[in-house]
């Protein structure tokens, strides 16, 4: 089974069109908010344990960070993985503490000022070269879980993963948008460390690679999992 992990302020249904594009539709996207009461390590172990027929793990942004944690756990049975626009972590404790405070502020706004929260989220510079993700379903009822995801899965709580990436021996496809400069740099460093990594850079594409360039993303994933 091919497992798709959604991004922050995302929804498992965001992956529906990509799952439908897989031959035999052999894929699913779990609701990651079921795990927000746990830290990244524990969440990763649970996801691994719930996928005995593990084939391909696909993760975008926050889901990509969770995917990397899954691959580094000793109960991982994944055969291959696709990492899209993912961060490998902050190096210094100062950076981590700043990020934790920032994510706690996001969490507070998600609970208390939802409309303001969404507006500020979409106006971030990271999305300036990306499209909105079109949804016919609401994230509003997930706001408490979204807040918890900022608190428990903050990038500030994540250890810096680059020193551990050489332990991931399975094939990795790392996808990033050429306009997403910070994550382009992260992807380049990560793929130099990973023993079996192919890096694909999509032209004229920002952070939200799957939704900025859905046809190329689906083609890349399907070619990789064959």
Predicted regions and their residues:
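Conserved HGGG/HGGXW glycine-rich cap/lid loop of the alpha/beta-hydrolase fold
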Residues: 1-37
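Conserved acidic catalytic loop of the alpha/beta-hydrolase fold
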Residues: 41-55
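Gly/Ala-rich beta-loop-alpha elbow adjacent to hydrolase catalytic centers
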Residues: 59-63, 67
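Flexible "cap/lid" loop of the alpha/beta hydrolase fold
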Residues: 72, 78-109
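Conserved alpha/beta-hydrolase catalytic His-Asp/Glu region
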Residues: 93-97, 109-164
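Short beta-strand/loop motif that positions the catalytic acidic residue
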Residues: 168, 174-176
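Conserved alpha/beta-hydrolase "acid-adjacent" motif
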Residues: 181-186
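Catalytic histidine-centered segment of alpha/beta-hydrolase-like enzymes
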Residues: 205-214
């Amino acid at each position: 089974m091919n497992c798709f992990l959604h991004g922050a302020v995302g929804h498992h249904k965001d992956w529906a069109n990509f799952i439908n594009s897989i031959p035999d539709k052999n894929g699913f996207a779990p609701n990651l908010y079921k795990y927000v009461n746990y830290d990244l390590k524990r969440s990763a172990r649970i996801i691994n344990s719930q996928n005995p027929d593990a084939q391909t793990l696909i993760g975008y942004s926050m889901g990509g960070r969770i995917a990397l944690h899954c691959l580094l756990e000793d109960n991982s049975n994944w055969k291959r993985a696709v990492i899209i626009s993912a961060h490998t972590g902050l190096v210094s404790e100062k950076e981590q503490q700043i990020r934790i405070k920032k994510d706690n502020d996001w969490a507070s706004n998600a609970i208390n000022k939802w409309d303001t929260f969404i507006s500020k989220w979409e106006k971030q510079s990271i999305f300036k070269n990306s499209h909105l993700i079109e949804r016919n379903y609401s994230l509003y009822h997930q706001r408490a879980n979204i807040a918890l995801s900022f608190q428990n899965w903050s990038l500030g709580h994540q250890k810096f993963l680059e020193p551990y990436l050489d332990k991931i021996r399975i094939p990795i496809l790392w996808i990033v948008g050429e306009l997403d400069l910070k994550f382009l740099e992260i992807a380049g460093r990560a793929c130099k460390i990973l023993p079996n990594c192919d890096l694909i850079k999509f032209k004229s594409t920002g952070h939200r690679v799957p939704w900025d360039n859905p046809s190329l993303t689906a083609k890349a994933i399907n070619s990789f999992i064959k």
